Amino acid sequence: MAIRIFAILFSTFVFGTFAHAQEGMRERSDWRKFFSEFQAKGTIVVADERQTDRVILVFDQVRSEKRYSPASTFKIPHTLFALDAGAARDEFQVFRWDGIKRSFAAHNQDQDLRSAMRNSTVWIYELFAKEIGEDKARRYLKQIDYGNADPSTSNGDYWIDGNLAIAAQEQIAFLRKLYHNELPFRVEHQRLVKDLMIVEAGRNWILRAKTGWEGRIGWWVGWVEWPTGPVFFALNIDTPNRMDDLFKREAIVRAILRSIEALPPNPAVNSDAAR
């Protein structure tokens, strides 16, 4: 009898919690117009925490649960890994350019963590990955519950060409932990990474974000901080026209955030087109 009562109570708790979570998620099919305006196919998840009750808004919920390569959005957790493992000391450490000419001119010079994040300097993170190693990277990924937590690769960087994959919904969960300093890393390291993520700011708001692109899929993830609370976002879109499609990531997100007053009208658009 006791077992049966426990089972009933457990089922009630689990399904009640699930139902409550679902009640907080709203499909915004009307946001299709923002994707159509730029002839883009994709998904966006917005978690608005400016009120007491968090509201999760999503366009294309099915796609928002599908995992893709994180590309350079992975620089957010990867920087935490590097700091924790000692591959990077702080934001002032200079990493000397190896002299190899790469396709992005901004990559062909000495770097620090701030420039590496801003310019999506891949070779810096390749150095970090080599020093950290696959086994330790896997442990880190599992500790932060990041996507499929698989850093294996047969060719290329595991966060671009390898097996690591994450869904837009999972990006939001990770970003929330970072915002609240709830990741298993030193608080000062989490604060530093958030500082590196700043894209722009106004009198009473701050936009922190990171782009990503692996050739077929483009990302923009981050959040806007307001005095009343943060608004998290994670967008991914198909990029059949490759670099010609990259501006659409920020354009769509900004239009959607402005539509719910999570960004001021027509703020300056950052032109980051790195992957």
UniProtKB/Swiss-Prot annotation:
Q: Which gene encodes it?
A: bla
Organism, as annotated:
Pseudomonas aeruginosa
Query: What is a biological process (GO) this protein takes part in?
Result: antibiotic catabolic process
Phylogenetic lineage: Bacteria, Pseudomonadati, Pseudomonadota, Gammaproteobacteria, Pseudomonadales
Question: Which keywords label this protein?
Answer: Antibiotic resistance, Hydrolase, Plasmid, Signal
Q: Which reaction does it catalyse?
A: a beta-lactam + H2O = a substituted beta-amino acid
**What's the protein here called?**
Beta-lactamase OXA-3
Instruction: State the function annotated in the UniProt record.
Output: This is an oxacillin-hydrolyzing beta-lactamase.
> Got any disulfides in this one, which pairs?
none
Q: Could you say which residues form the signal peptide? A: 1-21
GO MF: beta-lactamase activity; penicillin binding
